[in-house]
């Protein structure tokens, strides 16, 4: 049975882990790094994922997609998407059903599809390490993701060729990794500030039982926002000094973004850093190049992002309130996500809880490790671990007057199922539309519409008489199914919620086929590169051998080798791996006689050497060296 892998699909970076014996282990990617940038780029000839995509972002900003997790499961009309459109250099467009998609080089991609490219890279990383195919995974999502975002993440897994056995909340995964070997009873708060999202989760841990008491957060608050504050500051300062607006230049903006991220990281360990960006623009009058050389202090950074850090504290307070706890009830605070390396974040958390956070986990890797543990639980490799998670937002339906009627309250332990009886609003009403919402507002329209369906052919009856039972069912992934049943006739209508846009099964199948086709194209491209490398190496060594040993074979053999070299050089121009491999084989066959001649010649030389060595016995005296010795005596020896 193949391994189930654990994947932390992050906004900025992603990470993959497996269970290695009784402990989870992070797997390094092909570049030797333990995390992979969640970036996908499209060039004229290929698709790049991870570090190669990040490296070329400055020169190809419009076709380099990053932070796509912020778009997953969202509509183009969402305020967050409108905000994102102004910040990113790539195009965010309507996918045709109101969903936010991205457009690159004239092609549209859903956020699930872009995420699938990243998941494929994670899958390949695991397969390369394990030496066997991987088909199943546990994937993490922010705890505060709604149903549409969870469903879209599951779709991404399917497109990548993975069966997603479980969607697990990131803070819960972190708690699993933190508490795996801990036997004592503790109440912990997981403060997770990542690249694009923020979560706070309160859990009770007791000898293998992990029970989530409450969760809260903000799915549009993270390191990307911190970076943009620095970018805007740098652009404003440059405009004041040179009168040039760098935000209008996509390439300059991408350079600023990279510089901002680097400066932010450096300021976690030093009090000052220099931002040096030569030739970032041109003076519009004189045409002379303009350079950015600027110092940024930690104090200035903290003043730029102070309100963002403060914003995390409201969800923390709400989570404690929902759990029925006070700050003093928390035994340990676990910090997760790269942004928790920032000293000001640690300072704010310490000030709020009145105690130092736990620093024993790697904030970049702990979520993937937890996902691997959950994978181990599902596979039966990890025993005595029970995880009880919660739904982050209330679920309900729209009733008369547009009111949001809750069926399942937020922070209800999942999986769960709940039913309620409703009736018709008018006499002889023969159909009802069930509109399903998720959120905390009192009016349905202010919450997130997850989907809708109709229950039809209700027998004519006075208003209030028919009994319609609406049942909500949330599985362990936090994904919702809703059914409506007319108790009089037994008629039932049921749906698994798909975002009011969402990807249809046909679209997912098309994307799966597209991903498979791309995987085949990638494989062929790799084969071509490897064949070219082998051919060039063989040509070089053959030519060198001919120069040194050509005189050891007859002229016809030399001519055959030179013809084979020429044919292989010609094949190299064709970009056809099959032709190149054929040329390699021909040259190897032609060179065989040369190899035999070289081998025979070296053997003959070795034989001659031995014969010379045995020509006569050496005079023993030849090896003797005369030397004078002085007797030190006892005193001198001391």
From Swiss-Prot:
SUPFAM superfamilies: Actin-like ATPase domain (SSF53067), Heat shock protein 70kD (HSP70), C-terminal subdomain (SSF100934), Heat shock protein 70kD (HSP70), peptide-binding domain (SSF100920)
Domain of life: Bacteria
Modified residues (Phosphothreonine): 197
One GO molecular-function entry: ATP binding
Residue ranges, annotated region (Disordered): 603-638
InterPro entries assigned to the protein according to its UniProt record, in alphabetical order: ATPase_NBD (IPR043129), Chaperone_DnaK (IPR012725), Heat_shock_70_CS (IPR018181), HSP70_C_sf (IPR029048), HSP70_peptide-bd_sf (IPR029047), Hsp_70_fam (IPR013126)
Function: Acts as a chaperone.
Name listed for the protein in its UniProt record: Chaperone protein DnaK
Protein species of origin: Paracoccus denitrificans (strain Pd 1222)
Taxonomic lineage from the root: Bacteria, Pseudomonadati, Pseudomonadota, Alphaproteobacteria, Rhodobacterales
Gene that produces this protein: dnaK
């Amino acid at each position: 049975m193949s391994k189930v892998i654990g994947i932390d699909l992050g906004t900025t970076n992603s990470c993959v882990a497996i269970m290695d014996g009784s402990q989870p282990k992070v797997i390094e990617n092909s570049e030797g790094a333990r995390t992979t940038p969640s970036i996908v780029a499209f060039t004229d000839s290929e698709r790049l994922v991870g570090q190669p995509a990040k490296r070329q972002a400055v020169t190809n900003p419009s076709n380099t997609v990053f932070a796509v997790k912020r778009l997953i499961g969202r509509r183009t009309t969402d305020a967050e998407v409108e905000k994102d459109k102004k910040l990113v250099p790539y195009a965010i467009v309507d996918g045709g059903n109101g969903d936010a998609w991205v457009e690159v080089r004239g092609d549209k991609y859903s956020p699930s599809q872009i995420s699938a490219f990243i998941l494929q890279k994670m899958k390949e990383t695991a397969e390369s390490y394990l030496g066997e195919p991987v088909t199943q995974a546990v994937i993490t999502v922010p705890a505060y993701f709604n149903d549409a975002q969870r469903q879209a993440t599951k779709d991404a897994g399917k497109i990548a060729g993975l069966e997603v056995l479980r969607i697990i909340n990131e803070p819960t995964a972190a708690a699993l990794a933190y508490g795996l070997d801990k036997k004592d009873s503790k109440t912990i708060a997981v403060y997770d500030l990542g690249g694009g999202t923020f979560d706070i989760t309160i859990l009770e841990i007791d000898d293998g039982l992990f029970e989530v008491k409450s969760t809260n957060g903000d799915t549009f608050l993270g390191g990307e926002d911190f970076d943009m504050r620095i970018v805007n500051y740098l652009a404003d300062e440059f405009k004041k000094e040179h009168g040039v607006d760098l935000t209008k230049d996509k390439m300059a903006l991408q350079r600023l973004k990279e510089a901002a991220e680097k400066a932010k990281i450096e300021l976690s360990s030093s009090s000052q850093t220099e931002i040096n960006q030569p030739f970032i623009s041109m003076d519009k009058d004189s045409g002379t190049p303009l350079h950015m050389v600027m110092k940024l202090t930690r104090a200035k950074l903290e003043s730029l992002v102070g309100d963002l850090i403060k914003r995390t504290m409201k969800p923390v307070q709400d989570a404690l309130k929902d759990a029925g706890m006070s700050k003093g009830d928390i035994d340990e605070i676990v910090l997760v996500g790269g942004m928790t390396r920032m000293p000001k974040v640690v300072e704010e958390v310490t000030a709020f809880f009145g105690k130092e956070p736990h620093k024993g986990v790697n904030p970049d890797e702990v979520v993937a490790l937890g996902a691997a543990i959950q994978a181990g639980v599902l596979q039966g490799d990890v025993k005595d671990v029970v995880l009880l998670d919660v739904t982050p937002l209330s679920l309900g339906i729209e009733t008369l007057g547009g009111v949001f009627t809750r069926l399942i309250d937020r922070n209800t332990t999942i999986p769960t199922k709940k039913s309620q009886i409703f009736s018709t609003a008018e006499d002889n009403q023969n159909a009802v539309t069930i509109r399903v919402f998720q959120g905390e507002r009192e009016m349905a329209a202010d919450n997130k519409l997850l989907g809708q369906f109709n229950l039809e052919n209700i027998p004519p009856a006075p208003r209030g008489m028919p009994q319609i039972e609406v049942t909500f069912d949330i599985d362990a992934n936090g994904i919702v199914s809703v059914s409506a049943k007319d108790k009089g006739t037994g008629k039932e209508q049921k749906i698994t919620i798909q975002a009011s846009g969402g990807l249809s099964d046909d679209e997912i199948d098309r994307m799966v086929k597209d991903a498979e086709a791309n995987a085949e194209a990638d494989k062929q491209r790799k084969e071509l590169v490897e064949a070219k490398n082998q051919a060039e190496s063989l040509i070089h060594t053959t030519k060198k051998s001919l120069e040194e040993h050509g005189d050891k074979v007859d002229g016809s053999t030399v001519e055959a080798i030179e013809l084979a070299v020429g044919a292989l050089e010609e094949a190299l121009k064709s970009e056809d791996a099959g032709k190149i491999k054929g040329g390699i084989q021909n040259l190897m066959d032609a060179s065989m006689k040369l190899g035999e001649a070289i081998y025979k010649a070296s053997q003959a030389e070795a034989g001659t050497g031995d014969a010379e060595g045995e020509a006569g016995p050496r005079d023993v005296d030849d090896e003797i060296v005369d030397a004078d010795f002085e007797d030190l005596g006892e005193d001198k020896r001391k």
